[in-house]
Every structure is written in C-alpha cells, then in structure tokens.
C-alpha cells in the first residue's frame, strides 16, 4: 500500500468510499481543563477513555501557537487514543517525532488540530479514525520530514486536511498517504510542495472539494509559498 508514496506529486483516483465516521463527535465521559499541556512520554500510550480535554476558557487566541499552547504533546513513538479535544484551546496535539493518534476528535479547531514535527525520512505517523470540525486553516500541519498516514478520518468545515509546511526554516521532502477519509465543506485534502518532491496519495476519499490535491512552490523561512497548480494522475 505505502509503495504508492513513490509517485511524486500524484493524486490517485479511486472509487469513493466514505469511511470517516459521520455521526458527530462522541459524547464525552468527563471534561478536564488544564493550565498546561499533558505530555505523553516516548513510546507510551495515553487512553483517555473518551474524556474531553481543553486549556480553559479564552485559550483560543489569534496568531501562531507553540508547544506551550497545545492540549497534548506526544514524544517520539507515543500514542494518544479515544479522546475529545474541546474548543477551548489554541493548539490541539503536537507530535515531537512520529506518533500515533487513534480516534482523536476535535470539536472546534482554533489554529491547527495536529502538528507533526521532528520526524525524519522513513518515520511514519498514523492518524486513524477520529475527525475535526471548524478548522479555518489546517487540520494537520506537517513540519517534519517523514510520512503522515491519515486513515478513515472525518473532516467538516475546514481549510486544508493536510499541509506540508510551506515556509519552514529548513525544508525537506514530505509524504502523506490518505485513505478512507470523508471531507466536506472545505478546501484542499492535501497541499504539498512540488519543488521539494512532496508526495500525496489519495485512496477511497469522499469529498466535495473542487481540487483535492494542490501543488505549492514552497520556500524556506520568512516567505510566502505560492500555489502553482493541481495534482494529476
């Protein structure tokens, strides 16, 4: 399956199969507001048991956020599962290295739902199930250099499901594999930098996006990436 990632800047057409759960955000079993991020150590698993976590009223403010603004920080190889990220947050989940998210839901995205960075070529991050609502910009921001796999995810009212960093200070090739995703009322499913050799593979994706895969001319720091076209294949 992942061998398809070798096809640079490619969109693989496939029969539509809406596999993202369309029943809405699960009902939380409990709610917790924390004054600081929860850190999950390298290689460890945090099962939230369907509780809701946020950062408290007023946490969603304008501008880019950092680790201090996240609800969860996952160290390399950590897993977060069965959790709802509430609307009172600036940043949702930060992965410092490859990570796994299983059935992680975002009620109302403020800046970015998921940021992946610190991963290297050959590393794989997995986002399995779950979903996100009301992401005015990006759901998944990828700043590292590995592969992000998004499987059976649901997105509604969003800017982009996945974006390869357009202006990180240090740039590299990034890969994304997206399968079984359902995405409505939004923009790109994936935005990738063609000049850095990024790849996007879409398989069994159900969406009303006009252009599911968009190509950009990325740049390194202090600049604005330019949209240059659409994927073909």
Swiss-Prot record:
Gene3D superfamilies: Single-stranded right-handed beta-helix, Pectin lyase-like. Its main location: secreted. One of its GO terms (cellular component) is extracellular region. Coiled coil: none annotated. It is found in: Secreted. Keywords: Calcium, Carbohydrate metabolism, Cell wall biogenesis/degradation, Glycoprotein, Lyase, Polysaccharide degradation, Secreted, Signal. It catalyses: Eliminative cleavage of (1->4)-alpha-D-galacturonan to give oligosaccharides with 4-deoxy-alpha-D-galact-4-enuronosyl groups at their non-reducing ends. Residues 1-17 form the signal peptide. Its EC number is 4.2.2.2. It is an enzyme of class 4 (lyase). Binds 1 Ca(2+) ion per subunit. Its cofactor is Ca(2+). InterPro entries: Pectate_lyase_PlyH/PlyE-like, Pectin_lyas_fold, Pectin_lyase_fold/virulence. Glycans are attached at residue 167. One of its GO terms (biological process) is pectin catabolic process. GO terms for molecular function: pectate lyase activity. Belongs to the polysaccharide lyase 3 family. Pectinolytic enzyme consist of four classes of enzymes: pectin lyase, polygalacturonase, pectin methylesterase and rhamnogalacturonase. Among pectinolytic enzymes, pectin lyase is the most important in depolymerization of pectin, since it cleaves internal glycosidic bonds of highly methylated pectins. Favors pectate, the anion, over pectin, the methyl ester. This is Probable pectate lyase F.
């Amino acid at each position: 399956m992942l061998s398809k990632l070798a096809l640079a800047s490619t969109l693989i057409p496939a029969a539509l199969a809406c596999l993202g759960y369309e029943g809405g955000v699960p009902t939380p079993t409990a709610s917790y507001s924390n004054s600081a991020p929860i850190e999950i150590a390298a290689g460890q698993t945090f099962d939230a048991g369907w509780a809701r976590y946020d950062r408290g009223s007023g946490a969603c403010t304008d501008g880019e956020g950092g680790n201090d603004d996240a609800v969860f920080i996952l160290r390399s190889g950590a897993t977060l599962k069965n959790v709802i990220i509430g609307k009172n947050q600036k940043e949702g989940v930060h992965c410092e290295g490859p990570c796994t998210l299983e059935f992680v839901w975002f009620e109302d995205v403020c800046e970015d739902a998921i940021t992946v960075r610190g991963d290297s070529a050959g590393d794989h991050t997995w986002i399995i199930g779950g979903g996100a609502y009301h992401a005015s910009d990006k759901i998944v921001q990828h700043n590292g250099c590995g592969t992000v796999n998004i499987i059976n995810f649901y997105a509604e009212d969003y800017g982009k499901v996945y974006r390869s960093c357009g202006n990180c200070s240090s740039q590299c090739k990034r890969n994304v594999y997206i399968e079984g995703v359902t995405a409505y009322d939004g923009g790109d499913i994936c935005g990738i930098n063609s000049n850095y050799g990024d790849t996007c593979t879409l398989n069994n994706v159900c969406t009303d996006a006009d252009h599911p895969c968009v190509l950009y001319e990325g740049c390194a720091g202090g600049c604005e990436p330019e949209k240059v076209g659409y994927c073909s294949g």
